[in-house]
């Protein structure tokens, strides 16, 4: 009788797959320092409000904008670093060849979904950036600060989704090349 070894799940790929992934990871690491800036400006707000009884009008919206922007970028970072969510119950239980086909399905479905989201986000960003007559007019928050953060976030969502579509295309090409190379052997 042969002794069976328990199946060990695959380790996530630690290396970016292409130049775009490398750039996203590098830029994301730099932008992650903005989380610290958010902590500092939030601390500033607490000090001003509770020690000097002089609350700010800009900290809450600015901190929310920075945090929201970083979370949007976090989506393309997770995909670039291969840290996205997958159903490991199925993925880890199948052979490496089957994983390649699951990756192919994942990239096809993801490409379709990201493309539809990018298309939808375009109309939201366009409405947030331009008046109905075509003049540039950024949507603002409507608060005392009245910053153009809503328009900037909608534009960032559109850009991030366009990048995600490109990522899916590049990853799909790599998956197809990997299948072709395996089938040729």
What is the predicted role of each segment?
Residues 2-185:
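Alpha-helical transmembrane segments and membrane-interface helix-loop junctions
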């Amino acid at each position: 009788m042969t002794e069976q070894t328990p199946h060990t799940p695959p380790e996530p790929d630690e290396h970016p797959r292409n130049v775009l992934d490398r750039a996203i990871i590098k830029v994301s690491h730099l932008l992650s320092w903005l989380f610290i800036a958010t902590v500092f400006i939030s601390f500033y707000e607490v000090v001003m409000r509770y020690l000097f009884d002089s609350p700010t009008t800009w900290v809450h919206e600015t901190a929310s904008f920075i945090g929201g922007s970083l979370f949007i970028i976090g989506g393309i970072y997770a995909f670039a670093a291969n840290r996205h969510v997958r159903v490991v119950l199925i993925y880890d239980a199948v052979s490496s060849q089957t994983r390649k086909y699951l990756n192919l399905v994942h990239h096809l479905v993801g490409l379709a979904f990201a493309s539809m989201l990018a298309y939808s986000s375009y109309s939201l960003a366009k409405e947030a950036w331009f008046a109905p007559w075509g003049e540039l007019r950024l949507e603002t928050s409507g608060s005392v600060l009245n910053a153009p953060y809503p328009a900037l976030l909608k534009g960032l969502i559109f850009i991030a989704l366009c990048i995600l579509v490109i990522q899916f295309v590049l990853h799909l090409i790599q998956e197809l090349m990997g299948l072709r190379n395996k089938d040729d052997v």
